[in-house]
Amino acid sequence: MFPHLVGLGINEPTQIERYSLRQEAHKDVLKIYFKKQKGELFAKSVKFKYPRQIKNVLVDSGSHQYKEVTEINRNLTLVIDELNKITKPEVMGEVDVKQKILNDLRHLEKVVASKIAEIEADLQKLN
């Protein structure tokens, strides 16, 4: 019923609660969250990274100028279609988009801070 999710190793797609999708450099990062099981402190999640497809698009036919653009991976769109059938997400309004951007920014701050701490710890090990 959900061949693309099963192909990712998700054997029980009905246990999916929600998902998030964000872009990092030239990759799209899909994170799938599962329903919390009895006795678990946190819900289980898995993360998948998909390279963005790069295309050259003609900008000006007179001067034959091309611009490199990236777009979502076709396999990822198929996975998202299946996820939407399971989670039935709400359509975001304009205010929600602003909040999503702010949430993405806060997440990025945490990721960068964590990476800096990891690198500093590695440096300490060298001393």
From Swiss-Prot:
Classification of source organism: Bacteria, Pseudomonadati, Pseudomonadota, Gammaproteobacteria, Vibrionales
InterPro entries (UniProt xref):
UPF0325
Highest taxon in the source lineage: Bacteria
Give the similarity note: Belongs to the UPF0325 family.
User: HAMAP family, alphabetically?
Assistant: UPF0325
| Annotated protein name in UniProt | UPF0325 protein VC_2264
State the organism named in the record. Vibrio cholerae serotype O1 (strain ATCC 39315 / El Tor Inaba N16961)
